[in-house]
UniProtKB/Swiss-Prot annotation:
Disulfide bonds listed in the record: none
Subunit annotation: Component of the biogenesis of lysosome-related organelles complex-1 (BLOC-1) composed of at least BLI1, BLS1, CNL1, KXD1, SNN1 and VAB2.
Localisation: Endosome
Pfam families with a match to the protein in the record: BLI1
Family the UniProt entry places it in: Belongs to the BLI1 family.
Coiled coil: 57-97
Function: Component of the biogenesis of lysosome-related organelles complex-1 (BLOC-1) involved in endosomal cargo sorting.
InterPro entries reported in the protein's UniProt record: BLI1
UniProt keywords, alphabetically: Coiled coil, Endosome, Transport
Lineage: Eukaryota, Fungi, Dikarya, Ascomycota, Saccharomycotina
A single GO cellular-component term on record: endosome
The protein's name in its UniProt record: Biogenesis of lysosome-related organelles complex 1 subunit BLI1
Length: 113
């Protein structure tokens, strides 16, 4: 029985040692986590003071303004496209008039007056 008691005592001692080591590791982890959490909270507070967030009304106003600008930009793009097409048509018309003028001048120069 003496050897069994010693074995039981050694196992109990080993379990206690492991428990102490585990408890120490847990305490260190909790301490590190707490320290980092506090550091992150301080950093977050610093960022909040440095960069003020816009409230929902201001964000909605910005979004509405962006939508309005997009709409105006689309209208301008449509107008530019229209004027580009008009320019091409006028250019074609001008070329046709030049050709007709040349043809008409040749025709008039051939007929005796």
């Amino acid at each position: 029985m003496g050897e069994q008691n010693k074995l039981y005592y050694d196992v109990e001692k080993l379990v206690n040692s492991l428990q102490e080591s585990f408890d120490l590791d847990c305490a260190q982890s909790v301490s590190l986590f707490t320290s980092k959490s506090r550091s992150n909270e301080a950093w977050l507070e610093e960022l909040e003071n440095k960069f003020k967030l816009k409230d929902d009304v201001e964000l909605d106003d910005v979004e509405n303004l962006r939508a309005e600008i997009d709409m105006k930009l689309n209208m301008l793009e449509d107008k530019v496209s229209y004027y580009e097409r008009l320019y091409k048509e006028l250019e074609e018309f001008q070329n046709e008039i030049k050709i007709k003028t040349v043809v008409n001048n040749r025709r008039q120069s051939r007929t005796p007056i």
